[in-house]
A protein has these predicted regions:
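Catalytic domains of cell-wall/extracellular-matrix polysaccharide-remodeling enzymes
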Residues: 1-133
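Low-complexity, Gly/Ser/Thr/Pro-rich intrinsically disordered linker/tail segments
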Residues: 123-149
């Protein structure tokens, strides 16, 4: 599809990333690749599909101190509309905090700003955060504080 065509040229993808970071005034060496749940933090790699791998390999070949971070779970559109979907996501995140895995107590939830344009969706997001803090003692931090970054 459209993302595959976009990602076909890693030089262009990287150029876009650099341009967008400069335009937005971002100085972080952390990147999320569009349409790709791919990770590279130091020597750790996870879920690097072929397209993402090419971009990551390019950054490595340029000796860029770049981290690529994906997500452990994501907020789906139906969670913005249905509270039961929010409860399901709360349980999923809670389970991830106790599951044996790399960076066990650290969970990245992918959220897209366009999913929070209604008062209902904002109420659901507030509930999500509060319930994770109450039930699982979750702490929310900037991605820059993720282990290894």
């Amino acid at each position: 599809g459209r993302l595959n065509r976009y990602n076909a040229n890693p030089d262009s993808v990287w150029s876009d990333i650099v341009h967008n970071k400069e335009f937005l005034g971002l100085t972080s060496n952390i990147t999320r690749l569009p349409g790709s749940n791919s990770w590279k933090i130091g020597n750790y790699r996870r879920g690097t599909n072929l397209v993402a791998y090419k971009v990551i390999k390019l950054a490595d070949s340029l000796h860029l101190p770049q981290h690529f971070i994906g997500w452990d779970t994501e907020w789906q559109l139906n969670a913005s509309e249905q509270m039961r979907q929010v409860d399901s996501l709360i349980q999923k995140v809670g389970k991830l905090t106790i599951k044996k895995r790399t960076n066990q107590k650290h969970v990245v939830v992918l959220l897209h700003d366009f999913l929070f344009r209604t008062s209902t969706s904002l109420t659901h997001l507030t509930y999500f955060i509060e319930q994770l803090q109450i039930k699982y003692k979750c702490k929310f931090e900037w991605i820059e504080n993720y282990p290894g970054v």
